[in-house]
Amino acid sequence: MKAFLLVAALAMLFVLGPVLAMRPSPRQGQLARLRARAVAAGLRVRVEGGRNPGRVADYVLPWRLDDLQQVRGLRLVLRRGDDGAWEDAESLAAPAGILREVCEAVPAGVSALRSIDEGLAAQWNEKGRDEDVERIRDAL
């Protein structure tokens, strides 16, 4: 009888072990929440491949069809330096006052703002609160 219970317990461990291992970690759950909230807010999330722990994701506000003529050829690249100050990486076509407001509105984890073919992108480390997604959307 003891041997049967031992075998049954071992079998349960073999069944439950992989199931418990498939549960997402708290960080993975947070990322899923942030990305779902971004999609619901009208943003697209682009994550580069790889398992680099310092990676960032692009939160992209897509161009609207009526914007396409005005923004074709727009090149905007702003990077946040190590000291937290924004640096102009290329010549800017937008008025400086608007850019200053945008730079102040984004969360601290945003390391770059740029225009890409899909729309305006904020490069974010995704370390923040759920409300930061709306701050990014509103700033873009």
Model segments located where?
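Structured extramembrane domains adjacent to transmembrane segments
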Residues: 52-135, 139
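Short amphipathic alpha-helical surface micro-motifs
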Residues: 26-27, 39-43, 102-106
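Membrane-cytosol interface motif
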Residues: 35-49
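N-terminal signal-anchor transmembrane alpha helix of single-pass membrane proteins
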Residues: 1-37
